Amino acid sequence: MTQNPKKIKVTLVKSLIGTKQAHRATARGLGLRHVNSSVEVEDTPAVRGMINNIYYLVKSEV
């Protein structure tokens, strides 16, 4: 039987204007476009690394 993977809710709380191009690309990779947009993503090491990369722009909840 497979278990449901854990999800993390990620919300973009600061604007991407003036940030590094790589950080903008990371936010887009997570599916975040506008301020206050939220997505639920699977809890994987890759996703956690992306969140850590842009920690100052997002808020995350388990």
Curated annotation (Swiss-Prot):
Cited SUPFAM superfamilies: Ribosomal protein L30p/L7e
GO cellular component terms given for this protein: cytosolic large ribosomal subunit
CDD domains for the chain: Ribosomal_L30
GO molecular function terms listed in the Swiss-Prot or TrEMBL record: structural constituent of ribosome
Matching Pfam families: Ribosomal_L30
GO terms (BP aspect): translation
Domain of life: Bacteria
Residue stretches in coiled coil: none
InterPro entries noted in UniProt: Ribo_uL30_ferredoxin-like_sf, Ribosomal_uL30_bac-type, Ribosomal_uL30_ferredoxin-like
Keyword flag Cell inner membrane: no
Entry annotated with the keyword DNA-binding: no
Record keywords: Ribonucleoprotein, Ribosomal protein
Homology family: Belongs to the universal ribosomal protein uL30 family.
Subunit structure comment from the entry: Part of the 50S ribosomal subunit.
Name listed for the protein in its UniProt record: Large ribosomal subunit protein uL30
Organism whose genome encodes this protein: Nitrosospira multiformis (strain ATCC 25196 / NCIMB 11849 / C 71)
Gene name of the encoded protein: rpmD
